[in-house]
Amino acid sequence: MSRSIKKPPFCAPHVLRLVNKAIAQNKLNSIINIHSRSSVILNKFIGLTFGVYNGKTYVPVKVNDNMVGRKFGEFSPTRRYTGHVGDKKVSRK
């Protein structure tokens, strides 16, 4: 079920506070580290770089206009695909 039209998009208050602080200090090229993967990317975030925490490290995410309306967690994978291991059968001649 999708979110109600009456409600605004969810964005954690501390993320908004960090963004407003970065814009006020004109630090648009610095990375803003956040843990809130469930926050929605808003229009005012375009051009900023966020470090989204994936449980181990901060993954840098540069926000562009195609990302607006999506969540930060979509751009920071938490699981690493190691691939399928090779066939361990010994070849016979």
From Swiss-Prot:
The keyword Ribosomal protein applies. One of its GO terms (molecular function) is structural constituent of ribosome. It comes from the Bacteria. One of its GO terms (biological process) is ribosomal small subunit assembly. Transmembrane segments: none annotated. GO terms for cellular component: cytoplasm; small ribosomal subunit. Gene3D superfamilies: 30s Ribosomal Protein S19, Chain A. Keywords: Ribonucleoprotein, Ribosomal protein, RNA-binding, rRNA-binding. Belongs to the universal ribosomal protein uS19 family. Protein S19 forms a complex with S13 that binds strongly to the 16S ribosomal RNA. This is Small ribosomal subunit protein uS19. It comes from Ehrlichia chaffeensis (strain ATCC CRL-10679 / Arkansas).
